[in-house]
Amino acid sequence: IKREQQPLLGQIALGVAAVPFLSILYGITKGKYNYKVLKYTLFFEDLPKEFEGYKITQISDIHSGSFDNKQKVEYAVDLVNKQKSDVIMFTGDLVNSKTSEMIPWKTTFSNLTAKDGIFSVLGNHDYGDYIKWESEEEKNQNFNDMLKLQKEMGFQLLLDDAKFIQKEDQRIAVIGVENWGKGFKQKGDLKKASSKIDANDFKILLSHDPSHWEYEVLKDNLHYHLTLSGHTHGMQFGIEIPGLVKWSPIKWRYKYWAGVYQKANQILNVNRGFGYLAFPGRVGIWPEITVITLKKGKRDRNNIF
């Protein structure tokens, strides 16, 4: 009996051992381009009535220096446009290390389009801090090239600044801060970015790192209705079953690491990222295109989002 069971037990052991290997293999070959469109409807009592049903598409963490499949990336850009949102908001990390990584993809991402334009902010990887430069002048030139590139692509880059989207006699404020992260560059100046806006404006804040929401935004005197972040990538590894399981090792580093959170009557969305970095794949945490619809109304247990 034992001789007959050993081959079966061996086969089971091999099968179990193969699961992580196959998962990683899938993540490298397919998962990193397995784009998912995640849709949320968010309710705000003080949303200006002219913006009822207003649609925002958020993308984050493009990391163009990692891409190796032009067709897949073009498909994803087309998928963003197919959402037909009123505005596109990009929350940083266009590149891995230097601006030139984006040059082969400039035309592709220049095809992004939305009625009210594209707003963007910088992430920690967009400053050229993760590469050794021959001189400070070369690093400064790289940064200036980043600013120029975003403008040429049609991105309205907000460097501690704010713009308004106007509909009839009502408006919403779009505020963008430079990178501010716990343990990372803390260049962003929320006070400066918000200096143009009124306290009663409906506010959408773009801030690359969700730790900024936790450590500064929630404590600020102004009420930021909706904050959009990225940065974590959900660690590109985890398990998500909607309504049942949401887990990634990144949870031990970031309290807010993927999806929608609500605190102090303010809402944060952490996008899982469009691209990938370091590990050349994604396992269980797929590249994300977020579509948010704004609705006027009171949030309760049945319609928080």
What are these regions, as identified by a protein language model?
Residues P20-S23:
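Membrane-embedded alpha-helical transmembrane segments of multi-pass integral membrane proteins
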Residues Q11-A18, H225, G234:
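N-terminal presequences and immediately downstream first alpha-helices
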Residues I1-V16, Y26-I59, G65-Q83:
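N-terminal signal-anchor transmembrane helix
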Residues L47-F305:
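Soluble catalytic domains of enzymes that build or remodel membrane lipids, polysaccharides, and related
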